[in-house]
Amino acid sequence: MKSLKAGEETTNFSIILEDGDPALNPANRPRLSEAIEMIIGTANGYQVPFAAIPLLEHQDIPEQNLYKCLFGRDSLLISDLLYGARPDLRLNVLCALASFQGKVIDPISEEEPGCIPHEVRESNDPVAIKLTKQGGWKFPYYGSVDATLIWMRQLHAEALLKPEILDTEVSGISLWRRSLAATEWILNRLSSPSGLIESNRANPRGIENQVWKDSGDSYMHLDGTLARGDSTASVETVGEAYDALLS
């Protein structure tokens, strides 16, 4: 563990990987084709890339399984990056996330009509059980203001290549109708006092910064103090909202 700086203190510390762990040996890294197959899982019947998965040696380490599920922004971006190798994944992710698209207002899960979820887990998932019990969450969890924006952009990219996919029905609703619901969500969020999409969590125990940089210390004021509260608008989200509306 590195030495602490002046004013810092250790609040929690645990060793996850020891020196000599197989994961630290470059020779044990899988080939790209193998790695792609490793991250593929199933969500509501669709084959999708999970945000991250542990190596075989780490299957029983809880911390290594934190992202072994369908994540809104992560799975969308991964499927786009892997389009050349697995072009089927992008539409799969779009449909899988659409099947969980928000229908009602639920402050606990932060679900809102038209919103694409941040994190989708089965009820028996150990991480879901822990976050539900200790964090006051509910799954699917919708605490993300950029997943819907990225979903719109990826749908546009897929439709440019194959316009007919807009008629694809997910749970009885076509993707183009779902894009209208997503657009309504975006316009509603843009009606904030700043005219920008802000985090504004509904669950006080939910994620504070509901964007790519979602750590609690990701945003600061000019004087260096942490930007706490729920009215932070990231510059990335401004650009993503612009792209989504153009889509």
Model-derived regions: residue spans:
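Acidic, mature catalytic/reactive cores of soluble proteins
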Residues: 1-247
